[in-house]
Amino acid sequence: MTNEEELVVLADEEGNAIGTAPKATVHTTDTPLHFAFSSYILNPRGELLVTRRALSKKTWPGVWTNSMCGHPAPDETNADAIRRRGVSELGLDFGSFLDIQVVLDDYRYRAEDSSGIVEWEICPVHLVRLAVGEFVEPLPDEVEEFAWEEPQKVFDAVDATPFVFSPWMVDQLSHPELRQAILEAFDPEA
């Protein structure tokens, strides 16, 4: 999709696809409901990748958030979109994806940033396990900085200072099943 216009899939309130719109124009003060995905990426040691959104981002610039978010292209599965964005946005090796599982299948949210731009998404939340290493080389226009952290440290930080993190990350981590899935992902006793 490097030379093509990136499209997002629009949705109705029931979660049906109803068309497409250019990603470059869809996020406004009157953003239509559309499909997205959110992912939490773990390395083989069970550390969670957290990213700080680039300062040039249209929404929530400079805010810490989960590993990666994005939009599936028309006729693309979320798992394929996660692989595509993981390679293009984070510089992950395509072969490093061990497992992608949906944890919050029916997650959706609406949030408005300080500039009035709205995110309104049907956004299943995924847990991604990497088979090897943690080499990340993110695109500077997507990610300002990143860190691999122990999941419990991330949970504690989100609980103590939610204003430092994206509203979707704070809301997603309010679901105990997501926290449990992250903690158990590489736990041999789980």
From Swiss-Prot:
A Pfam family this chain is assigned to: NUDIX
EC number: 5.3.3.2
EC top class named in words: isomerase
Intracellular or extracellular location(s): Cytoplasm
Cofactor requirement: Mg(2+); Mn(2+)
Binding site for Mn(2+): H27, H34, H71, E119, E121
Catalysed transformations (reactions): isopentenyl diphosphate = dimethylallyl diphosphate
CDD domains in UniProt: NUDIX_IPP_Isomerase
Positions annotated to bind Mg(2+): C69, E89
GO cellular component: cytoplasm
Gene Ontology MF term list: isopentenyl-diphosphate delta-isomerase activity; metal ion binding
Record keywords, A-Z: Cytoplasm, Isomerase, Isoprene biosynthesis, Magnesium, Manganese, Metal-binding
Domain (Nudix hydrolase): residue spans on this chain: 32-171
Example GO biological process: dimethylallyl diphosphate biosynthetic process
Pathway: Isoprenoid biosynthesis; dimethylallyl diphosphate biosynthesis; dimethylallyl diphosphate from isopentenyl diphosphate: step 1/1
Record-annotated active site: C69, E121
Cofactor note: Binds 1 Mg(2+) ion per subunit. The magnesium ion binds only when substrate is bound.
SUPFAM superfamilies associated with the record: Nudix
The UniProt record lists the keyword 4Fe-4S: no
Keyword 4Fe-4S found: no
Biological function: Catalyzes the 1,3-allylic rearrangement of the homoallylic substrate isopentenyl (IPP) to its highly electrophilic allylic isomer, dimethylallyl diphosphate (DMAPP).
Family affiliation: Belongs to the IPP isomerase type 1 family.
UniProt-recorded name of the protein: Isopentenyl-diphosphate Delta-isomerase
Protein's gene: idi
